[in-house]
Amino acid sequence: MEKDTKQVDIIFRSKLPDIYIPNHLPLHSYCFENISEFSSRPCLINGANKQIYTYADVELNSRKVAAGLHKQGIQPKDTIMILLPNSPEFVFAFIGASYLGAISTMANPLFTPAEVVKQAKASSAKIIVTQACHVNKVKDYAFENDVKIICIDSAPEGCLHFSVLTQANEHDIPEVEIQPDDVVALPYSSGTTGLPKGVMLTHKGLVTSVAQQVDGENPNLYIHSEDVMLCVLPLFHIYSLNSVLLCGLRVGAAILIMQKFDIVSFLELIQRYKVTIGPFVPPIVLAIAKSPMVDDYDLSSVRTVMSGAAPLGKELEDTVRAKFPNAKLGQGYGMTEAGPVLAMCLAFAKEPFEIKSGACGTVVRNAEMKIVDPKTGNSLPRNQSGEICIRGDQIMKGYLNDPEATARTIDKEGWLYTGDIGYIDDDDELFIVDRLKELIKYKGFQVAPAELEALLLNHPNISDAAVVPMKDEQAGEVPVAFVVRSNGSTITEDEVKDFISKQVIFYKRIKRVFFVDAIPKSPSGKILRKDLRAKLAAGLPN
């Protein structure tokens, strides 16, 4: 990562002035700092059963859960795993752990048993908070390793019920000293290459990131206590956890929780609760654009539609503008390691700026961005494409137990290299044009080719394999495999797909298999994915 520093860096900043950020505060103290102004207002609305928790309720329940976790043996710097869909309990567990100076690692409840256990093991989780239907995925691992399982619905044999946490006395929270650099969240990300790694996000980092979005006289993302935010994106993903939950808590907005996206409930909830802020991802935007039912609902309350996690095309933008007549539509750009927000659309500001279609915002305030030539390491002026780099208090502390991967991602001067290629135009707007990194983006979810390749190579009838993205209208990208059969093997496409689908979550399943004589590689043995992508683009895989 050490690049030749021949010239002075060309650094880009927000059009908004820097602000004071109280990032000495622990995350929970910061989020609830102004709670006296809205303690009786709705904080969480459970879309599934219409239950409403006020800000006072959420703070109290989170404190009770903190005391309960302490009673179950959780100490500062210990980790709990939250293996849940969006739910009030997810919120109470996450904030409860923060009160103790403990860490939450969030996992997708749809993960296979192997994927969940891998993350539980890597993060050294002491407690797993989940639902009864997922207990079988972790039961053997938990019992062998003295890990407690706490269920939010019914508790199968050997598991505890979430009420052991919520019935604790909130005054029993121990006094703990939380340092700004202590880790509070540990999402897993594949980074720019390779297998999923624990991303250490600190109290200071998340406080800074939330403040960069919603604090200040002219916040970049203007949300207030009269707003209703739709939380349909999964909270185990940092975009939803940060830009929906934490930002919403900080400003006193109502957060309407949906367990999973389905278009009818989605439209009904927007109409019933007069949702004003819609943080979406392109697949949801596509569903809105394509559904004839949208016209039967009143969506006029929505004033902001944010899209993140993957680029949104111009046609899609125009269609959505027509469906949400009163909404400003814009994009943000994030990466888990960056805390996660790097850039955000300034049309969302309290005093908005004009924006361009296709841009993903301008760099957030209190941060610095530069565009670097991947070959020379020199920073580039406006309108020249290079690797996007970000620096500021919001970025990750590093990867858990992986100093090498950390050093490859963050240089000695504190610059985080994103692996994304983009440029900044004359109006400070950021455009993303390509990815250096190898990740496949399926509906905003990361798929690491290396993970699938390792599984493919375990098959006795496969001698070599490479996985690359293929464009897909609905998902954005899907994984496809190029496979070299072992001597004399007659393994079929369906057999390969079936072999993988048993081992991974749905979005990592291989959609096509192309059999080849050899995988193209560089002299150092690196797979030349560029060549394989070019083959796909030319329509000549075999």
Swiss-Prot record:
Keywords: ATP-binding, Ligase, Magnesium, Nucleotide-binding, Phenylpropanoid metabolism. Residues 332-399 are annotated as: SBD2. The keyword Ligase applies. (E)-4-coumaroyl-AMP binds at residues 239, 243, 309, 332, 336, 344, 420, 435, 437, 441. (E)-feruloyl-AMP binds at residues 239, 243, 309, 332, 336, 344, 420, 435, 437, 441. Changing residue 341 to G: Reduced activity against 4-coumarate. Mainly expressed in old stems and, to a lower extent, in flowers (e.g. in ovary), leaves, young stems, shoot tips and patel limbs. Its EC number is 6.2.1.12, 6.2.1.-, 6.2.1.34. Pathway: Phytoalexin biosynthesis; 3,4',5-trihydroxystilbene biosynthesis; 3,4',5-trihydroxystilbene from trans-4-coumarate: step 1/2. Belongs to the ATP-dependent AMP-binding enzyme family. This is 4-coumarate--CoA ligase 2.
